[in-house]
């Protein structure tokens, strides 16, 4: 009980200095969500951005992380219109990640999608399958954190297929729960989203 309280106090102490930039990010995400954008990330970061904005998660990439080349393959497939490879996950094809005690979808010998917050494959598949259709008709903003076996060189092809691609690095990038408590990381992402919004305003004036 005491340790839990102490951890909560420490978390709040780290959270307070980032509140202004988190509010700014929430405003940016709401504006981009209203403009028809969707966030994709290789870890929980996209989901946390929607939480900052108080919006439903218009992305399947929440509560999970990709390993190895699985994220690059995912990005390339959906940009090519091959969403059928990913639009529906069968829980019977999933395994359990023994270290994390959660559901996992293997996509290769050393790659896969780890559903960190979902212990049961049925729940993980249901969450993914309900959220994936929300990407339809939306322009994607891609966030790639260089960690969990994801190297920037793996993303070279995917970068050419998306107008808005943000790389969080250098490797190893902070995990999502640390990233959202780091003012420098949040400021860099906010500056990137400012550029996306500015491009949208410029396009609207033409």
Can you annotate each of these PLM segments?
Residues 1-34:
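Membrane-proximal basic amphipathic "stem/tether" segments
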Residues 131-180:
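Extended, basic/helix-rich recognition subdomains
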Residues 172-203:
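C-terminal regions of proteins
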């Amino acid at each position: 009980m005491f340790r839990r309280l102490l951890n909560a106090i420490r978390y709040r102490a780290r959270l307070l200095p980032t509140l202004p930039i988190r509010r700014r990010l929430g405003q940016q995400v709401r504006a981009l969500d209203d403009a028809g954008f969707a966030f994709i990330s290789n870890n929980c970061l996209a989901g946390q951005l929607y939480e900052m904005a108080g919006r439903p998660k218009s992305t399947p990439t929440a509560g999970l992380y990709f390993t190895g080349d699985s994220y690059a393959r995912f990005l390339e497939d959906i940009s090519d219109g091959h969403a059928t490879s990913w639009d529906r996950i069968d829980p019977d094809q999933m395994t359990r990640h023994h270290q994390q005690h959660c559901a996992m979808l293997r996509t290769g010998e050393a790659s896969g999608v780890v559903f960190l917050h979902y212990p049961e494959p049925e729940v993980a598949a249901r969450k993914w399958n309900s959220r994936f259709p929300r990407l339809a008709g939306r322009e994607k903003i891609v966030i790639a954190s260089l960690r969990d076996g994801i190297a920037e060189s793996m993303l070279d092809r995917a970068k050419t297929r998306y107008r808005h691609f943000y790389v969080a690095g250098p490797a190893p990038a902070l995990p999502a729960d640390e990233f959202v408590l780091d003012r420098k990381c949040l400021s860099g992402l906010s500056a990137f989203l400012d550029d996306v919004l500015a491009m949208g305003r410029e396009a609207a004036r033409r």
